[in-house]
From Swiss-Prot:
Its EC number is 2.7.4.9. Coiled coil: none annotated. It comes from Monkeypox virus. It comes from the Viruses. Keywords: ATP-binding, Early protein, Kinase, Nucleotide biosynthesis, Nucleotide-binding, Transferase. GO terms for molecular function: ATP binding; dTMP kinase activity; nucleoside diphosphate kinase activity. This is Thymidylate kinase. Induction: Expressed in the early phase of the viral replicative cycle. Disulfide bonds: none annotated. The keyword ATP-binding applies. Homodimer; the dimer arrangement is orthogonal and not antiparallel as in human enzyme. Pfam families: Thymidylate_kin. GO terms for biological process: dTDP biosynthetic process; dTTP biosynthetic process; dUDP biosynthetic process. Pathway: Pyrimidine metabolism; dTTP biosynthesis.
Length: 204
């Protein structure tokens, strides 16, 4: 039995990640695919993260980074098991978000990556570009929904994309929604059909 593919959607806040994830979930047989999003706010760490994001509590940046990282590690075994059982996982945000947001606040990229080192490695990361309209919508109630900060996050994403050690697929914001939906579906289906070998380890 071939393993499942680990496919991650990344991008700035309000770039359409969840919408595109749901489009994929509707396009592929339900018994072969599952959806997972981070942070998972139902866990102990997730509830602490939710309190921070919604401005109910404050923590220093180092604690925040570790909380987000721990939240992903809580699901590392689940991700590994699902992939080995032939289930493809569509993941809305992953370690790349953690690193981009942490480094945008001044953390070391090397240190931030070290916290995530060893997590299951994605077979494909789809990065959704944001147009000016989406970027200007990044003003909201949660703590990171700020246009200036989101621009800093974007620069950190670009640094990771340029490293070339992960298979990134960048989706332009200029595509019409129906074209974007079909393009992403085809990219995901190809990734599922061509995945080979054991699950890798991220940044090892």
């Amino acid at each position: 039995m071939s393993r499942g593919a680990l496919i991650v959607f990344e991008g700035l806040d309000k770039s359409g990640k969840t919408t595109q994830c749901m489009n994929i979930m509707e396009s592929i047989p339900a018994n072969t695919i599952k959806y997972l999003n981070f942070p998972q706010r139902s866990t102990v760490t997730g509830k602490m993260i939710d309190d921070y994001l919604t401005r109910k509590k404050t923590y220093n940046d180092h604690i925040v980074n570790l909380l987000f990282c721990a939240n992903r590690w809580e699901f590392a075994s689940f991700i590994q098991e699902q992939l080995e059982q032939g289930i493809t996982l569509i993941v809305d945000r992953y370690a790349f978000s953690g690193v981009a947001y942490a480094t945008a606040k001044g953390a070391s990229m090397t240190l931030s990556k070290s916290y995530e080192s060893g997590l299951p490695k994605p077979d494909l990361v789809i990065f959704l570009e944001s147009g000016s309209k989406e970027i200007n919508r990044n003003i909201g109630e949660e703590i990171y929904e700020d246009v200036e900060f989101q621009q800093k996050v974007l620069q950190e994403y670009k640094k990771m994309i340029e490293e070339g050690d992960i298979h990134w697929q960048i989706i332009s914001s200029e595509f019409e929604e129906d074209v974007k939906k079909e393009l992403i579906k085809n990219i995901v289906i190809e990734a599922i059909h061509t995945v080979t070998g054991p699950v890798g380890q991220l940044w090892m």
